[in-house]
């Protein structure tokens, strides 16, 4: 015991820090007792008691929820939580729903922890108390099955209600009525509106098998109100519908005007044109432009009517004729513009809404949409109409042109004319032209419209002879358009002309209802005889008459228009020539563009297609003729110029112009044969075959020589690749001449330029003679060559030159014929004689040109690229047109003659360069005659002398560098981005040209023959023009050489009889094929005609444009490029 005690005492001391291991109870007892430690003893005692309590069972009374008392026994060691589970299980209760309350013997609540053993608590009663159920959410009610029921009411309204399908309709009625806002007392439930039998309200929806009801308010007032509301709604709907229809119509009309480049045929019906134009508008024109043009569209059906024209006078400037005339006779333009605008009325009307729009989008050939019917009738009806009324005929022609909405140039032309009218100043006109050039799309559409009308009027002519003539018309229209609008409208006209000679033909028919040729001659002579005002009318009328004369001479007619316009404008041969040169130069440049249309298509769509080239070329020739005629007869300067222009306007006219007395003969001759085309039609027809456009460009050289040269260097690859580019409808219609023509033109130009330099030095007569000889050989070949630009490559020097010379003779011959015609019909006959061996060839060429024209028109490959280029260079084309117009104004006044001389010299110098660029060649070639007259016309030094030759574009062609400089200036003036501004053809273009030449040999042989026929006359004219221009007449050889150098460079070396003609012919042939869009060619021609008046006024300011052309060949190319592209 003693031993134990000390141990326990020590132990507790030791274990206190731990305080966990109590001593054994016995020992503790003993220890506690012995030690008498109260704490230790008490603790030990409590623990012992607890242990004893835990070890034993405990009896409990359990109070269940229903105050049911149950007794149970549990082991004292069971924790309280376990006790709850145990009791709930014993009495089938949910432990989660109950809690345990403990009561002691004294009925006190005992607090416990869930893990406290029940034995340690002095528990007497356990109460199972349910937890607080109030906090719980009430159990969800099972949803009642419902269905969706559609309730129709008030005829047009419906609502949806969800109701029980088993409930009777009587129970559902209040719900339905409240939903429909009806009075349940006056509401009937029907199966549907038609059935008047009310439903049985005692049945449920399931019983009726319905899920849709009609609730009818039987109240009279509500019924009446509902009926009235329905009526009012119907009226409102109708009103809205009609309003939308109106607005839609307006939109469509507006859209149709700008978007009818290729929709010209659909133009007759607003719906068609609108629908077609809409996409175009959205793509090419701003929505505002269409809106503004909406108003003009209604007049478009009466596009021929003067009031409509007057209404659109300001817009009409795009149609160069009115404006150029207006420029000379400031206030004569309203009527004139009306006339001119008749063709491009819709175009101008569409552009009228927006001056800016007008500038940028003269394309809305709204009038053309309505003229398609005219186009078919124009051949017979318009011819009679236009000769009768100077204004109405032109209006008819232009209305026809607008009909052909597909030609955007028309719009631009209209705009140009309008602006020219407004400004009435040559300097102002160039600005307008620049503006118009920027709105190239508008200009082009208008020209295209004219061409389209011409094509429609004379589809056959457009194809063969018409191909060249169409080019002439295109040239004329482009001249007008370019005078006023720059070159854009011309290009469109060219395209349209290529596609359709109807417009010009219509004009011709109108002018020459009974006897197209004679009427043209007579009217042409009569109008030229009149004063400037009369000339204005004469130009328009003559243009129309010429149109009548030229189904085949559609181009001539258009040329006549510009020429007359120019003559009228300047009042003197020089002034007129300047204007004509401005117009002619523009077309010529455009013609050059088609030659290098690939190069210049974007920049100038002046010669969208070969017809456009022809138109320009013929225009150029006409210009030359008129200038020459004016040179010969200063007294008859204006009238003679006018008649010359009229004569030259049509292929016959060019012939007629050579000998005014012989005008009728020649007019008919060109119509029947390509011999007249040789003088003028030849220029135009062959230029289409042989890229007459270059000749036209030469003609334009005065105003737009740069275009031509630039056009030469600017044979665009696309043009070269696809020689048969057709202007797109929606686009500004920059028609890209098929690559073959362009390549051929390039090759021809390069070679022709070389030959031109060499052969240009040779007497033009030699060139003429050689051309006749070569034309004989080459026209056979060049028929194929014109057909396919490949031939020029093989015959690059002989045939391309021949073609070029052919083209130049076309260009020069036309002027020469014009000169000879005024001077003597014999020279014209000599020309023809020179080309006599080719007179049949001309017919062949006409046939070939027709076939080529068709093939080009059918050539869809060129179109895409052309369209793309058009889109690309649309603005530039507009600028080009404006620049052309400006150039026309500036060039004649400042120093056209000097420029012409410089150009001639430069032409001789850049011969190789121009040879490289067929465009330049053609322009040079064309400008030769025009240069001769460009001195007078552009320089205004020898108005009588130089006024006749419309081939004055030579100055532009002459200096390649000068032309480039001017081209740059022109481009700057135009503000048109020129995709291709190369002064020479690109290697690709050359390659294409070579390949095209190889193909063209076979295809364009007949066209080549035609071209050859033309070149002699052109050469003579070119000679005469050169003499007039440089040495008046003494230096015919030298001047001719210079002019021919430029002319040949532009017209692929007109001076070189042997090589030049071949080259020219090939180029012309290719040009003819390039103008595959007759409508656009037509419109280009119409635009040229329109711009003729504007050009006449612009001619005074033409020197700047000439300078641009001469100094900046590339610039001219730039300007031409858009038109060329436009044309193609």
Swiss-Prot record:
A motif (KKRRAP 2) lies at residues 360-365. Keywords: Phosphoprotein, Repeat. It holds the Pfam family Cobl. Residues 1081-1101 form the WH2 domain. One of its GO terms (molecular function) is cadherin binding. The modification Phosphoserine is found at residues 204, 222, 256, 273, 326, 333, 344, 356, 438, 441, 461, 471, 474, 563, 584, 786, 813-814, 821, 911, 917, 947, 1069-1070, 1121. InterPro entries: COBL-like (IPR039895), Cordon-bleu_ubiquitin_domain (IPR019025), WH2_dom (IPR003124). Residues 416-425 have a biased composition (Acidic residues). Residues 475-488, 899-908 have a biased composition (Basic and acidic residues). Residues 270-286, 345-357, 397-415, 1045-1081, 1103-1122 have a biased composition (Polar residues). Coiled coil: none annotated. Residues 1-35, 249-309, 325-441, 454-499, 780-840, 882-964, 995-1081, 1103-1128 are annotated as: Disordered. This is Cordon-bleu protein-like 1. It comes from Homo sapiens. The lineage of its organism: Eukaryota, Metazoa, Chordata, Craniata, Vertebrata.
């Amino acid at each position: 015991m003693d031993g134990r005690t000390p141990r326990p005492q020590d132990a507790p001391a030791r274990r206190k820090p731990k305080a966990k291991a109590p001593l054994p109870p016995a020992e503790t007892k003993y220890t506690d007792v012995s030690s008498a430690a109260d704490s230790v003893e008490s603790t030990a005692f409590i623990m012992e008691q607890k242990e004893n309590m835990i070890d034993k069972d405990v009896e409990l009374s359990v109070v269940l929820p229903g105050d049911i008392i149950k007794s149970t026994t549990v082991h004292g060691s069971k924790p309280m939580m376990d006790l709850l589970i145990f009791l709930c299980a014993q009495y089938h209760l949910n432990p989660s729903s109950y809690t345990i309350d403990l009561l002691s013997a004294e009925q006190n609540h005992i607090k416990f922890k869930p893990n406290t053993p029940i034995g340690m608590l002095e528990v007497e009663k356990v109460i199972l108390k349910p937890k607080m159920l109030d906090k719980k959410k009430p159990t969800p009610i099972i949803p009642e099955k419902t269905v969706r029921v559609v309730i129709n009411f008030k005829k047009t309204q419906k609502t949806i209600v969800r109701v029980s399908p088993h409930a009777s309709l009587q129970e559902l009625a209040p719900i339905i009525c409240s939903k429909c806002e009806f009075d349940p007392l006056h509401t009937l439930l029907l199966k549907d509106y038609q059935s008047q039998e009310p439903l049985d309200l005692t049945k449920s929806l399931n019983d009726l098998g319905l899920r849709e009801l009609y609730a009818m308010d039987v109240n009279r007032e509500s019924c009446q109100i509902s009926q009235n509301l329905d009526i009012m709604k119907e009226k409102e709907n109708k009103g809205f519908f009609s309003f939308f229809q109106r607005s839609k119509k307006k939109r469509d009309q507006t859209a149709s005007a700008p978007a009818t480049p290729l929709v010209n045929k659909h133009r007759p019906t607003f719906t068609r044109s609108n629908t077609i134009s809409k996409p175009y508008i959205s793509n090419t024109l701003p929505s505002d432009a269409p809106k503004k043009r909406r108003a003009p569209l209604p007049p478009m059906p009466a596009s021929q009517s003067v009031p409509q024209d007057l209404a659109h006078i300001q817009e009409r400037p795009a149609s160069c004729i009115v404006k150029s005339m207006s420029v000379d006779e400031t206030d004569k333009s309203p009527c004139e513009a009306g006339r001119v605008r008749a063709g491009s009325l819709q175009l101008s009307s569409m552009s009228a809404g927006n001056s800016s729009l007008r500038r940028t989008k003269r394309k809305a050939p709204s009038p053309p949409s309505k003229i398609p019917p005219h186009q078919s009738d124009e051949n017979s009806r318009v011819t009679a109409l236009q000769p009768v009324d100077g204004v109405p005929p032109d209006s008819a022609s232009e209305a026809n042109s607008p009909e052909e909405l597909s030609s955007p140039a028309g719009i631009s032309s209209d705009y140009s004319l309008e602006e020219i009218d407004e400004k009435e100043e040559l300097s102002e006109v160039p600005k307008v032209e620049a503006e118009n050039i920027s709105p190239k799309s508008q200009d082009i559409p208008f020209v295209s419209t004219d061409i389209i009308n011409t094509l429609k009027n004379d589809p056959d002519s457009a194809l063969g002879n018409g191909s060249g003539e169409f080019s002439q018309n295109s040239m004329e229209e482009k001249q007008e358009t370019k005078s006023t609008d720059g070159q854009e409208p011309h290009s469109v006209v060219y395209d349209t002309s290529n596609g359709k000679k109807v417009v010009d033909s219509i004009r011709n028919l109108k002018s020459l209802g009974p006897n197209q040729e004679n009427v043209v001659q007579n009217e042409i002579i009569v109008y030229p005889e009149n004063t400037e005002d009369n000339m204005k009318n004469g130009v328009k009328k003559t243009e129309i008459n010429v149109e009548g004369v030229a189904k085949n001479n559609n181009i001539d007619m258009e040329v006549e228009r510009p020429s007359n316009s120019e003559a009228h404008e300047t009042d003197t041969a020089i002034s007129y020539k300047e204007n004509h040169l401005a117009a002619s130069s523009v077309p010529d440049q455009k013609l050059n563009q088609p030659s290098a249309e690939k190069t210049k298509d974007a920049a100038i769509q002046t010669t969208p297609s070969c017809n456009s080239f022809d138109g320009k070329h013929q225009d150029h020739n006409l210009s030359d003729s008129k200038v020459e005629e004016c040179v010969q007869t200063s007294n008859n300067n204006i009238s003679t110029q006018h008649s010359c222009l009229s004569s030259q306007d049509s292929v016959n006219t060019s012939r007629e112009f050579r000998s005014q007395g012989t005008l009728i003969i020649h007019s008919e001759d060109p119509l029947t044969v390509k011999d007249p085309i040789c003088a003028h039609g030849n220029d135009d027809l062959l230029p289409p075959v042989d890229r007459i456009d270059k000749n036209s460009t030469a003609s334009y050289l005065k105003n737009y020589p740069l275009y031509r040269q630039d056009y030469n260097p600017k044979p665009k690859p696309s043009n070269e690749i696809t020689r048969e580019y057709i202007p797109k409808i929606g686009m500004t219609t920059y028609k890209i001449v098929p690559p073959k023509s362009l390549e051929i033109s390039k090759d021809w130009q390069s070679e022709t330029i070389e030959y031109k330099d060499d052969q240009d030095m040779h007497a033009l007569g030699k060139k003429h003679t050689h051309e006749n000889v070569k034309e004989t050989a080459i026209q056979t070949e060049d028929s194929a060559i014109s057909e396919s630009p490949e031939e020029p490559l093989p015959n690059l020097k002989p045939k391309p030159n021949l073609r070029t010379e052919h083209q130049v003779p076309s260009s020069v011959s036309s002027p020469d014929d014009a000169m000879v015609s005024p001077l003597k019909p014999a020279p014209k006959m000599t020309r023809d004689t020179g080309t006599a061996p080719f007179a049949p060839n001309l017919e062949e060429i006409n046939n070939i040109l027709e076939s080529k024209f068709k093939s080009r028109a059918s050539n869809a490959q060129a179109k895409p690229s052309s369209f793309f280029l058009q889109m690309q260079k649309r603005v530039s084309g507009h600028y080009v047109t404006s620049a052309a117009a400006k150039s026309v104004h500036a060039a004649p006044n400042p120093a056209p003659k000097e420029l012409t001389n410089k150009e001639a010299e430069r032409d001789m110098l850049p011969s190789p360069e121009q040879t490289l660029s067929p465009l330049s060649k053609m322009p040079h070639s064309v400008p030769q005659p025009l240069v001769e007259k460009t001195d007078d016309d552009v320089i205004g030094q020898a108005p009588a002398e130089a006024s006749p030759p419309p081939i004055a574009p030579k100055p532009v062609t002459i200096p390649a560098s000068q032309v480039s400089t001017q081209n740059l200036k022109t481009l700057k003036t135009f503000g048109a981005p020129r995709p291709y501004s190369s002064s020479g053809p690109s290697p690709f273009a050359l390659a294409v040209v070579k390949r095209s030449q190889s193909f063209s040999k076979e295809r364009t042989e007949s066209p080549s023959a035609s071209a050859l026929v033309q070149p002699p006359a052109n050469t003579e004219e070119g000679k005469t023009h050169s003499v007039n221009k440089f040495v008046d007449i003494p230096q015919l050889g030298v001047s001719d050489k210079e002019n021919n150098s430029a002319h040949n460079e532009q017209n692929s070396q007109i001076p070189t009889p042997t090589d030049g003609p071949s080259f020219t012919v090939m180029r012309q042939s290719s040009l003819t094929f390039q103008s595959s869009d007759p409508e656009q060619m037509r419109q280009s021609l119409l635009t040229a005609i329109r711009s003729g008046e504007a050009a006449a006024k612009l001619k005074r300011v033409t020197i700047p444009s000439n300078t641009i052309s001469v100094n900046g060949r590339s610039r001219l190319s730039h300007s031409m490029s858009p038109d060329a592209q436009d044309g193609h």
